Amino acid sequence: MQITDVRIRKISSEGKMKAIVSVTFDNEFVVHDIKVIEGQNGLFIAMPSRKTPTGEFKDIAHPIVMDSREKIQNEILSAYAKAIEEQDVEE
């Protein structure tokens, strides 16, 4: 499965959540609401999730294989860095 599009839908300079992203696979399947989060060890992605009645968050969709997660994260963080760079140029 190939990542065919990464769309940075919202960028925030405040707080730990830096962006909300949509990723399209093979021009056929899209996953919305992936978050770019700033953690203690740098940026990472959080897959879309929902809160359970017990207050725990569960992923709605997520990669099963670690290599897939790394590939998705690398593509998203690369697109995020490019969007930030373009935003700085426009300002």
UniProtKB/Swiss-Prot annotation:
The keyword Nucleotide-binding does not apply. Gene3D superfamilies: Stage V sporulation protein G. InterPro entries: SpoVG (IPR007170), SpoVG_sf (IPR036751). HAMAP family: SpoVG. Belongs to the SpoVG family. Could be involved in septation. GO terms for biological process: division septum assembly; sporulation resulting in formation of a cellular spore. Keywords: Cell cycle, Cell division, Septation. This is Putative septation protein SpoVG. It comes from the Bacteria. PANTHER family: SEPTATION PROTEIN SPOVG-RELATED. The keyword Cell cycle applies.
